[in-house]
Amino acid sequence: MFGIADYGAFVVAVIVFLAIPGPGNLALLGATGQGGIRSGMAATLGVIAGDQTLLWLAVSGISALLATYPAAFQTIQWVGAIYLVWLGAKLLRTRLDDAPALELKPDHFFKQAFFITVLNPKAIVFYMAFFPLFVNPAEHQGLITFAVMAATIAALTLAYGLVIVVSAHMLRSEEH
C-alpha cells in the first residue's frame, strides 16, 4: 500500500512504540496534571510536531548523515539527556506546598513536548533505523509513501494522546 511493505505491521509497530513508557508519555501526563485537557492536548500536538520533524529529517537524509557521523548522533543524545535531567531537576526543586500556582499556557506544554520528542534518543533511533524497514523499494512512490507514513503516525499519536490525556484527567478528577 503506497510503497509501505506491510501497512498493518507498520501500524502495530507504531502503536507499540507509542505505548512504551518514555519522556513523551510523561510530558503528556505532566501537562494534563498541571493544566488539564487543553494543556495535555497541546503537549500531544508538540509530540506530533516533534515526530513529524524527525520523520521528515530522516526522509531528507539527515539520518544517513547522523549514521555516517556517530559523534553528531551522540551529541544529540547528550543534549537530550541534559534537557531531560534539567526538566527533572526543575521539577524536584519545586515543592508543591510552597510553589505558587503557575498559570502556564498550553503553548508552554506544546514547546516542552516538542523539544522532549526531538531530543529523545528513542525517537531518533526509531526514525533512523526502524522506520526504513517498512519502505518497500520496489513499490516506493516517493513522497507519497512518506506522507502516508507521516499521516498514519500523526493520527495514531493524536488518538493515543487523546486517550492518555482524557484518562489522566478523569483519574485526577476522581481524586479531588
Residue ranges and their predicted role:
Residues 52, 56, 117, 158:
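Short alpha-helical functional segments enriched in proximate histidine and acidic residues
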Residues 110-118:
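A short amphipathic helical element positioned immediately N-terminal to and/or at the very start
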Residues 2-74, 129-153, 165-168:
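Juxtamembrane transmembrane-helix termini in multi-pass membrane transport proteins
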Residues 68-96, 154-164, 168, 172-175:
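Selective transmembrane alpha-helices of multi-pass membrane proteins
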Residues 121-122:
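Selected transmembrane alpha-helices and immediately adjacent juxtamembrane segments
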Residues 93-109:
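Flexible cytoplasmic inter-helical loops of multi-pass small-molecule transporters
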